[in-house]
Amino acid sequence: MTNLDLYAKAEHLLGIEEATEALYDLYRSELDDYKVKTLLDVGCGRGGFMERMISDGVACKGVDLSSLMVEECRAKGLDAECKPAKDIDGKYDAIVSIFDVLNFMQKDELLEFLESMAEKLEDDGIFIADINTLYGFSDVAEGTMSNDTEEEFLSVDAAFENNELHTKFTLFQKDEDGRYTKYQDTIVQYFHKIVLFQKLKGLKLVDKQTFSLYDTEDKTLLIFKKR
């Protein structure tokens, strides 16, 4: 099991449903300003945003590095693949990366990813993503939390240092025989300064909006157009 698959198993215990819906609404409202007929959702998760855009008449494809997430998408009849976004064929009117997907990449990987996304955009295409602010990492994401049900227990311990957030997930799930299976892994996220996004070859940063998702100004929305 990859660390992203562990996240997929634990996501329902994190209490992020309201924040996820708020992000979906924000992205959807931004895309309303453009004539989007095709969309690629990078880091599509369980496909919630694709479902919303499909209801608006947009043809959607999703990619995610969690096989569990992709399986759930396919079970809903959504077009999703478990592979790096750079390996997806075709061009799209819009590409989105929702809920700090970019923060999961180190600088060099991120720059390569952004250039590959530019290549997958139609002329005048739009790419929208959100990132955590420094405050979002140091004051909001850092810390501990736990949650449990009759069948599961989750502990999350996050520490931010040297512009990296290391989040350890420990999940216990009850088996049919009454015993518990333990899953544990660490996910690393990276803080990126806005200046990094202002010097791209294939994408032009046309708008940035710092907003509050969990707390005051903990996220920034980035809107790019293809150069």
Language-model features: locations:
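A short glycine-rich, Lys/Arg-flanked "PGG" loop and its adjoining helix->strand segment in the class I
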Residues: 111-123
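A short SAM/SAH-binding and catalytic strip from SAM-dependent methyltransferases
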Residues: 94-109
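SAM-dependent methyltransferase
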Residues: 131-194
